Amino acid sequence: MPSIQKAACKYTGRFFVARMSSPYNHSPITSQHRDWNHLNTLPTAGLIIVRHRSLLLAYSNNKQAWYLPGGKIDAGETAKQALLREIHEELALNLDAEQLHFYTHISAPAYGETPAVMMAQDCFRCELGDVMPQAQAEIGAVRYFTLAEFQQLDTQVAGVVQVYACLQADGLV
């Protein structure tokens, strides 16, 4: 059974589940296996790309906030399948499943959702090298943020705050 570590979010002081000890023990979210509506939980997948100690974020025109690229897991999809689809739609990137490496699972209030919904997100790391994704669909912009730059934003989405805490704990940002 995988162990769960806790980390304190320096922005709120609250504790949250930061990551599982091994991605090999991880069972990906699959929407067909859970009654998400009953639990008011939204299954999602997010992409983590770190370059020069900065995290790639995508600006959602719909929600007016910076997020991890990715999105909702549709019925019958695994988290990786959903992420590949979303990344193609949002960033014009054609990634292979082998490029995605499970990093962490986060759970946080889904920003801008009414009524309140919890987001459950499997996050996968990927290396792009010098390739810069292009914003498409509902994405208005993509850019890399250092932790200090992210902290200066007027809106800090809770899930992204958790990811930064994990990356900081691992010395990646």
Regions found by a protein language model. Give the residues of each.
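Positively charged N-terminal leader segments that act as targeting/secretion signals
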Residues: I4-A18
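Acidic, metal-coordinating catalytic segment for phosphate/diphosphate chemistry
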Residues: M20-G46
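Active-site-adjacent beta-strand/loop module that shapes the phosphate/pyrophosphate-binding cleft
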Residues: L42, T104-M132
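Short, well-ordered beta-strand micro-motif
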Residues: I49, C123-E127, Y144-T146
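Conserved Nudix-box catalytic region and its N-terminal flanking loop in Nudix hydrolases
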Residues: V50-E90, N94
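Nudix hydrolase/Nudix homology domain
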Residues: N61-A65, A137-V173
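A short coil-to-beta-strand element that immediately follows conserved catalytic motifs
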Residues: N94-T104
